[in-house]
């Protein structure tokens, strides 16, 4: 679990996301409250439930990006899912309980990796011993007394020399033959609605059929060391302990990001067919958000303390169109602002992995030096903003389209301009995009 303070979390998010201070503060406080709750003594700790968040804002302003970056900072089981993927029980589609099943799979993977890191050093030593046993088979005991001891000392000295060479990478390209455990073979089985649990058990049964068998492979020592280290580390793990920790981690620290929640709202001007299904999904989500117990292959998982963050553009619907019970389960509401020209400028140039830096790095691979003048970045931002105003407002995603169109010619003929410098200023932008940006019909289809 992350131990970062809210200010530190916001500072990290600022490196990648421009503006949206209210949303950043809300998710930062929610994440910090997970840690605070762990410091509270029982039985009060059980009574403290997470305050779920509803993020409201147009598309392309940073809702999904906040969730994506939060996942990296959280150091906790995290899943982002589209609410539109789910249907009411009885309809064709995914059951909402599969959210928790997917989350527990992520947690098991995280926990197993964390436990393997703890034993990695010991596992590496054992893997080195196995490789050295192949390279330097133990000599047969011949002779008596001193001769045997002398041979043993020589073998140990040679072994240490080879171990040193192995660690320095001098033997990486040498090939060895190994007997490795065969990985379990996964199977894809189409699951009928509501029968995901049974399907998972069948898949697990088939995957265990080939496990435990050895397979002889010829690999380079560098790869052999990695394969054997993983195998030795896996032997040291207590799988039951991993499962128990994973379930506990989901229950105490799990985060679910529900995207496109506005698409499952009920709207009065529509027919009753879709209405039933959408309301049904909301009612199925309700116990999950409220707190229920879901049966998974790793055991029963309680959702009482899982944090839910929902987001939606709410263009055609309002948050009040959600069923009242579900509205009440998202007490913290945050509105995200539409992006201004200044925001577009900052997105292009001010973030750690800005679009400008990405394209400069891409073209540098062909020895083309791409430079963006301040007035060029400003003009790009103005064009992206204007096109959003005239046509559909897709937020920051418009920048991808605009900059791709701008650099189309340079990217195509980069091989012919090796060693050259290309400067993108306002004149260059107007020459490449001016006509398209001004013609509304053209910009609707091209930008």
From Swiss-Prot:
Function of the molecule: ATPase subunit of a proteasome-like degradation complex; this subunit has chaperone activity. The binding of ATP and its subsequent hydrolysis by HslU are essential for unfolding of protein substrates subsequently hydrolyzed by HslV. HslU recognizes the N-terminal part of its protein substrates and unfolds these before they are guided to HslV for hydrolysis.
Pfam families: AAA (PF00004), AAA_2 (PF07724)
One cellular component (GO) term of this entry: HslUV protease complex
UniProt-recorded Gene Ontology molecular function terms: ATP binding; ATP hydrolysis activity; peptidase activity; proteasome-activating activity
Family classification: Belongs to the ClpX chaperone family. HslU subfamily.
Classification via CDD domains: RecA-like_HslU
Keyword set, alphabetical order: ATP-binding, Chaperone, Cytoplasm, Nucleotide-binding, Stress response
UniProt GO BP: protein unfolding; proteolysis involved in protein catabolic process
Localization annotation: Cytoplasm
InterPro entries, sorted: AAA+_ATPase, ATP-dep_Clp_protease_ClpX, ATPase_AAA_core, Clp_ATPase_C, HslU, P-loop_NTPase
Residues that coordinate or bind ATP: 18, 60-65, 259, 325, 397
Name under which the protein is recorded: ATP-dependent protease ATPase subunit HslU
Subunit note: A double ring-shaped homohexamer of HslV is capped on each side by a ring-shaped HslU homohexamer. The assembly of the HslU/HslV complex is dependent on binding of ATP.
Species of the source: Burkholderia cenocepacia (strain HI2424)
């Amino acid at each position: 679990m992350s131990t970062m303070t809210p200010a530190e979390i916001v500072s990290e998010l600022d490196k990648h996301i421009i503006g949206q201070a209210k949303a950043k503060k809300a998710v930062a406080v929610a994440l910090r409250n997970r840690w605070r709750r762990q410091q509270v003594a029982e039985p009060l700790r059980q009574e403290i439930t997470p305050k779920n968040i509803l993020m409201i804002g147009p598309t392309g302003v940073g809702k999904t990006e906040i969730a994506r970056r939060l996942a990296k900072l959280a150091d906790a089981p995290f899943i982002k899912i589209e609410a539109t993927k789910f249907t009411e029980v009885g309809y064709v589609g995914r059951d909402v309980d599969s959210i928790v099943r997917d989350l527990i799979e992520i947690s098991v993977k995280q926990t197993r990796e964390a436990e393997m890191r703890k034993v990695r050093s010991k596992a590496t030593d054992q893997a080195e011993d196995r490789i050295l046993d192949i390279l330097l088979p133990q000599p047969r005991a011949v002779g008596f007394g001193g001769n045997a001891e002398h041979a043993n000392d020589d073998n140990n000295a040679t072994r240490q020399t080879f171990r040193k060479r192995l660690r320095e990478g001098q033997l990486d390209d040498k090939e060895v033959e190994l007997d490795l455990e065969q990985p379990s073979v996964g199977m894809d089985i189409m699951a009928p609605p509501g029968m995901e649990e049974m399907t998972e058990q069948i898949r697990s049964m088939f995957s265990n059929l080939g496990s435990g068998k050895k397979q002889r492979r010829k690999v380079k020592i560098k790869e052999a060391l990695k394969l054997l280290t993983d195998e030795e580390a896996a032997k040291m793990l207590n799988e039951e302990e991993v499962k128990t920790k994973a379930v506990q981690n989901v229950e105490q620290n799990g985060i679910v990001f529900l995207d496109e929640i506005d698409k499952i709202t009920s709207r009065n001007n529509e027919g009753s067919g879709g209405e039933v299904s959408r309301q049904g999904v909301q009612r199925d989500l309700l116990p999950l958000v409220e707190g229920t117990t879901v049966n998974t292959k790793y055991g029963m998982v309680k959702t009482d303390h899982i944090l839910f963050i929902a987001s939606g553009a709410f263009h055609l619907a309002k948050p009040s169109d959600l069923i009242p019970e579900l509205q009440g389960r998202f007490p913290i509401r945050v509105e995200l602002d539409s992006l201004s020209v200044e925001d577009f400028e900052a997105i292009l140039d001010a973030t750690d992995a800005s679009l400008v830096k990405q394209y400069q790095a891409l073209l540098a691979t062909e020895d083309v030096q791409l430079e963006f003048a301040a007035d060029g970045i400003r003009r790009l931002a103005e064009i992206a903003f204007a096109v959003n105003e005239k046509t559909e407002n897709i937020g920051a995603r418009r920048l991808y389209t605009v900059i791709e169109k701008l650099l189309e010619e340079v990217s195509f003929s980069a091989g012919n301009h090796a060693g050259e410098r290309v400067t993108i200023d306002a004149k260059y932008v107007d020459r490449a995009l001016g006509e398209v940006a001004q013609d509304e019909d053209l910009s609707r289809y091209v930008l």
